[in-house]
Amino acid sequence: MKNKQAGFSLIELLIVVAIIGIIAAIAIPNLLASRRAANEGSAQSSLRTIHSAEGTYQATVGAGNYGTLAQLGAQNLIDPVLTTASKSGYNFGCTPTDLVAGTSPATFYATAVPQVTSGVGQSGTRRFGISTDGVMHGDSTALTAYANEAAVIAAPALGN
C-alpha cells in the first residue's frame, strides 16, 4: 500500500523563505528611515513645547526669568518624560540666562541632539535648537548640542 501525503517540498519552502527575506531586505530600511523621521518630528514638537512653557514660566513664577527643564517640569509645564532630558531618541537641554536689570533681558535656548548618531539604530540625522525668539533651527553638520544661543540662531532656520 502506498502512503502518499500531500505537503510542501523542501524546495518550495526554501523559495518562500527567500521571498520573505527579499521583502524584509526592502522593508526594514524604509521602516528605520520612518522611525528616524518620527523621532525628528517629536524632537521639534518637544522644543516648541519647551518654548511655550518658558513663556508661561517667565510670566508666572519666573519673576522675569526663564527656567531649566527641571523647573518647568516642577511647575507641570512640560511632560515629565521631557524633564529627564531624553525623549524619542533625542537628548534635550535647556539653558536659561537670567535677567540683569538695566543691562540685558532674560534669554534661553533649548537643544535636541540624537542619542545614537550612526549605525542601524541611528535615532536622528539632525540636531535642533530653539531660542527666545521662537524660531526653530536645525542642521546636520554636527550632531552635538549647540554651544550657546548665538550658535542656535546662526544655524539654518527650519520652515516655521
Annotate each PLM feature:
Residues A142-Y146:
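A short acidic/small-residue loop/turn micro-motif
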Residues S52-R126, I130-D133, S140, A151-N160:
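Extracellular/periplasmic head regions of type IV pilus-like filament subunits
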Residues I20, S34-A38, A147:
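Alpha-helix termini
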Residues K2, L13-V16, R36, T84, ...:
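Short, flexible coil/turn micro-motifs enriched in small/turn-prone residues
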